[in-house]
Curated annotation (Swiss-Prot):
<feature type="binding site">
    <location>
        <position position="59"/>
    </location>
    <ligand>
        <name>Zn(2+) 1</name>
    </ligand>
</feature>
<dbReference type="GO" id="GO:0006829">
    <property type="term" value="P:zinc ion transport"/>
</dbReference>
<keyword id="KW-0406">Ion transport</keyword>
<dbReference type="GO" id="GO:0010312">
    <property type="term" value="P:detoxification of zinc ion"/>
</dbReference>
<comment type="similarity">
    <text>Belongs to the cation transport ATPase (P-type) (TC 3.A.3) family. Type IB subfamily.</text>
</comment>
<dbReference type="GO" id="GO:0006882">
    <property type="term" value="P:intracellular zinc ion homeostasis"/>
</dbReference>
<keyword id="KW-1278">Translocase</keyword>
<dbReference type="GO" id="GO:0015086">
    <property type="term" value="F:cadmium ion transmembrane transporter activity"/>
</dbReference>
<comment type="function">
    <text>Confers resistance to zinc, cadmium and lead. Couples the hydrolysis of ATP with the export of zinc, cadmium or lead, with highest activity when the metals are present as metal-thiolate complexes. Can also bind nickel, copper, cobalt and mercury.</text>
</comment>
<dbReference type="Pfam" id="PF00702">
    <property type="entry name" value="Hydrolase"/>
</dbReference>
<dbReference type="GO" id="GO:0030001">
    <property type="term" value="P:metal ion transport"/>
</dbReference>
<keyword id="KW-0547">Nucleotide-binding</keyword>
<feature type="binding site">
    <location>
        <position position="628"/>
    </location>
    <ligand>
        <name>Mg(2+)</name>
    </ligand>
</feature>
<keyword id="KW-0862">Zinc</keyword>
<keyword id="KW-0813">Transport</keyword>
<keyword id="KW-0479">Metal-binding</keyword>
<feature type="topological domain" description="Periplasmic">
    <location>
        <position position="146"/>
    </location>
</feature>
């Protein structure tokens, strides 16, 4: 890694290895700072929001060091560094851009504008020059040591000073910016101390191992960001817009809803769009994990980033700049970094006292034996310096976020978006799942199966009235009724004063008369009681069409189970997770679905009833609520974790803690398995980190290990923890 100096140039910098997440405490983790960012303005409730793009962060400890430096500035209300998307966000009452840039420059970091082009990457030779230089100098020093001890000692001192200079400089910068216990500080003290007592070879070896750890750290950071980088690369930089019969190449930021664009075969959509071409196949695997191309017809929505498989297509832009499907996913990733798991917060608090405590122990080990027992100063100074290096909490600090980030990335690859470590941790504890029925267990596209009008009205008239009231509604049943009327080519009149009745139905004025569409049982319908019972017993949903309090007839609709619903329920049972259906549908229709899946159910529930049921179930064991509609949002909020189907409403997706973008219920099983695997991984990582520290603490006091083994142990623990966390990315 390299750290920018005050003039924006890169200087060699050595930092121990760390992985792929938002680490808790910059002061505590092995990293150095090469960060640069971008200032963009937006209004915020707490003042003005400024944002920069941050480049060069090789571990999440860099993010915490940047936060530390900015947080000390007067006038800063809030500061966040989002490691996955390399973004610095500062909320302030006044324009503090100059102060932020100055503070970070003094701390050894540089900033660039968020909209600026990516900085060109340094050549591999330049990037690895510090490591190569130190290896060559180390080899020369060993050679000289074999033939001439004095010259060998001088060579080791020179090697140490060359490696130490950038580290000590960065340590001073970080101390000035408030990061007192950064690994750069520990390394500087240990190397200088080793030189002081004549352990020149070990001082040089410590720095060499440190630099190797830094290169591993850079590799881990790039692996951590691969998913986000791939997602950002899904959007092309330009689009072909059709205007007045002419084609023009425009930047995607200039596209607006209503624009008509053209995408060639093999091209990616620059924005969410509505298909205007007759039909086409789209590869949406990068967004949803769905490997099979999806067939779309005229009027269907297609997300940004999807690829037109086999033909030139025309679409109408639906999304504003920065509000496409890809942008929403990136926003979820940013939000996920803000929602840290409880165990992450615990490790953060623990690490804040761990390093100072180890430094205090090292000082006592250095002073007490020589002062009280006349022991050798050189021996105990050496042991104290070794303990100082053991005090680096890199492996411990990254043990949790490395696993959580890998878990979140693995879930995203499979089309499951989990909003942060807290949600992932909660998901791993779930032993119950409550399902909404329509749109969750079923495909959410019911069809009209029967129309039964009262005497004196035709089927067409009944369907026309119902479609007029339901036009524009988002509920799957409403859309099915409108779709049926459109297929029949009926002239649908315009309804006025349309009003949704919570838990009951929807009403409107049609041709000056009040028409109500409601569930059977919400309005007296004695003449149709037998028919309603018969239809509901067959698993169909029945709605009444009421005009001026007179029941004009009933419309029956039926949805179909998702293809993988039965398999998903069976696999959940195998995991020890119990399922239950909570639905606003009638009991008979719910019973038909529940019987087919072998689930318990509660039917006829209003939104507040669902909340009550979820609260009661949640008191017995952690419960996940899976839904897709506005009426599911309160229940999802009340559950231990809310999970939205990707086809759900914006309200459901916003409320949920996780979402299945591909609408496959088996993805829920994979999410729970992955969450549990992540928990196990975290426990393993903490054991590795603390176990190795404990072992080397004892062996150091017994005189069995020295400085270079202490650094090797720290780097080794960090490598093991990171490698263990990366195993989650390979889970099937």
């Amino acid at each position: 890694m390299s750290t920018p100096d005050n003039h924006g140039k890169k200087a060699p910098q050595f930092a121990a290895f760390k992985p792929l997440t938002t680490v808790q405490n910059a002061n505590d983790c092995c990293c150095d700072g090469a960060c640069s960012s971008t200032p963009t303005l937006s209004e915020n409730v707490s003042g003005t929001r400024y944002s920069w793009k941050v480049s060069g962060m090789d571990c999440a400890a860099c993010a915490r060091k940047v936060e530390n430096a900015v947080r000390q500035l007067a006038g800063v209300n809030q500061v966040q560094v989002l490691f996955a998307t390399e973004k610095l966000v500062v909320d302030a009452d006044n324009d503090i851009r100059a102060q932020v840039e100055s503070a970070l420059q003094k701390a050894g970091y540089s900033l660039r504008d968020e909209q600026a082009a990516e900085e060109p990457q340094a050549s591999r030779l330049k990037e690895n020059l510090p490591l190569i230089t130190l290896i060559v100098m180390m080899a020369i020093s060993w050679g000289l040591e074999q033939f001439n001890h004095p010259f060998g000692q001088l060579a080791f001192i020179a090697t140490t000073l060359v490696g130490l200079y950038p580290i000590a400089r960065q340590a001073l910068r970080l101390i000035k910016s408030g990061s007192y216990f950064a690994i750069e500080t520990l390394m500087s003290v240990a190397a200088i101390g080793a030189l002081f007592i004549g352990a020149t070879a070990e001082a040089a070896m410590v720095l060499l191992l440190f630099l190797i750890g830094e290169r591993l750290e850079g590799w881990a950071a790039s692996r951590a960001r691969q998913g986000v980088s791939a997602l950002m690369a899904l959007k092309p930089e330009t689009a072909t817009r059709l205007r007045k019969g002419e084609r023009e190449e425009v930047a995607i930021n200039s596209l607006r809803p209503g624009d008509v664009i053209e995408v060639a075969a093999g091209g990616r959509l620059p924005a969410d769009g509505k298909l205007l071409s007759p039909f086409a196949s789209f590869d949406e695997s990068a967004l949803t994990g769905e490997s099979i191309p999806v067939e779309r017809a005229t009027g269907d929505k297609v997300p940004a980033g999807a690829t037109s498989v086999d033909r030139l297509v025309t679409l109408e832009v639906l999304s504003e700049p920065g509000a496409s499907a890809i942008d929403r996913i990136l926003k979820l990733i940013e939000e996920a970094e803000e929602r840290r798991a409880p165990i992450e917060r615990f490790i953060d608090r623990f690490s804040r006292i761990y390093t100072p405590a180890i430094m205090a122990v090292a000082l006592l080990v250095t002073l007490v034996p020589p002062l009280l027992f006349a022991a050798s100063w050189q021996e105990w100074i050496y042991k104290g310096l070794t303990l100082l290096l053991i005090g680096c909490p890199c492996a411990l600090v990254i043990s949790t976020p490395a696993a959580i980030t890998s878990g979140l990335a693995a879930a995203a690859r499979r089309g499951a978006l989990i909003k942060g470590g807290a949600a992932l941790e909660q998901l791993g504890r779930v032993t119950q799942v409550a399902f909404d029925k329509t749109g969750t267990l079923t495909v959410g596209k019911p069809r009209v199966t029967a129309i039964h009008p009262a005497t004196g009205i035709s089927e067409s008239e009944l369907l026309t009235l119902a479609a007029a009231v339901e036009q524009g509604a988002t509920h799957p049943l409403a859309q099915a009724i409108v779709r049926e009327a459109q297929v029949a080519e009926l002239a649908i009149p315009t309804a006025e004063s349309q009003r949704a009745l919570v838990g009951s139905g929807i009403e409107a004025q049609v041709n000056g008369e009040r028409v109500l569409i409601c569930a059977a049982g919400k309005h007296p319908a004695d003449a149709f009681t037998g028919l309603i019972n018969e239809l509901e017993s067959a698993g169909q949903t029945v709605v009444l069409v009421v005009r001026n309090d007179d029941v004009l007839g009933v419309i029956a609709l039926q949805d179909t189970l998702r293809a993988d619903a039965a398999t998903a329920i069976s696999e959940l049972n195998a995991l020890g997770v119990k399922g239950v259906i909570l639905t606003g549908d009638n009991p008979r229709a719910a019973a038909a679905i529940a019987g087919e899946l072998g689930l318990e159910f509660k039917a006829g529930l209003l939104p507040e009833d669902k909340v009550k049921a979820v609260t009661e179930l949640n008191q017995h064991a952690p419960l996940a609520m899976v839904g897709d509609g506005i009426n599911d949002a309160p229940a999802m909020k009340a559950a231990a974790i809310g999970i939205a189907m990707g086809s759900g409403t914006d309200v459901a997706l916003e409320t949920a803690d996780a979402a299945l973008t591909h609408n496959h219920l088996r993805g829920l099983v994979q999410m729970i398995e992955l969450a549990r695997a992540t928990h196990a991984n975290i426990r393993q990582n903490i054991t590795i980190a603390l176990g190795l520290k404990g072992i080397f603490l004892v062996t150091t006091l017994l005189g069995m290990t020295g400085l270079w083994l202490a650094v090797l142990a720290d780097t080794g623990a960090t490598v093991l923890v990171t490698a263990n966390a990366l195993r989650l990315l390979r889970r099937r």
